[in-house]
């Protein structure tokens, strides 16, 4: 930032996520880090107003990467899921979802490649007046629209309705 201030211009691009403006069950740490990144990005944007430095948030959504495989490895390493009260949910839904999600109909229909995100980043670096936010995939654009028109209560109902583990009865 000091170099950008000195030269009078620059671009800071943060790679955020759809989970930086909505939350999904059982993804608390990831949700929290992306919400924090969005807050930090907004703060920087305000603090750097008038300096010639643009602060941009790129929100990819479903992109074909190794995130699911890596998430599964870290989940098994750091979460004592077999002793958790959520064991059934993890076993029946979350672990299989992380294993199989890349082959799901949803992802085949909506998932983009990393090059598509790179093109958006390249564009945001070179366009005269970049947007504050680039929502990359159709699901990200759709959910951004839903966040803007639904109450928090109705948004949560929508997210819960489309979250398989929440449809499973809890053990008492």
Give the label of every model feature segment.
Residues 33-36:
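Active-site helix of classical SDR
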Residues 14:
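Rossmann-fold scaffold of SDR-type NAD(P)-dependent oxidoreductases
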């Amino acid at each position: 930032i000091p170099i950008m201030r000195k030269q009078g211009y620059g671009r800071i691009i943060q790679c955020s996520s759809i989970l930086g403006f909505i939350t999904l069950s059982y993804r608390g740490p990831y949700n929290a880090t992306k919400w924090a990144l969005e807050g930090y990005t907004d703060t920087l944007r305000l603090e750097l107003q008038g300096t010639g430095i643009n602060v941009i948030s790129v929100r990819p959504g479903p992109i074909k990467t190794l995130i699911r495989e890596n998430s599964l490895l870290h989940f098994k390493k750091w979460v004592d899921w077999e002793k958790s009260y959520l064991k059934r949910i993890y076993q029946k839904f979350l672990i299989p979802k992380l294993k199989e999600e890349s082959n799901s109909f949803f992802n085949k229909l909506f998932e983009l490649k990393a090059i598509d995100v790179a093109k958006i980043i390249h564009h945001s670096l070179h366009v005269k007046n970049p947007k504050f936010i680039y929502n990359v995939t159709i699901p990200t654009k759709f959910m951004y629209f839903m966040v803007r028109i639904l109450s928090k209560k109705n948004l949560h109902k929508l997210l819960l309705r489309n979250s398989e583990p929440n449809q499973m009865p809890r053990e008492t």
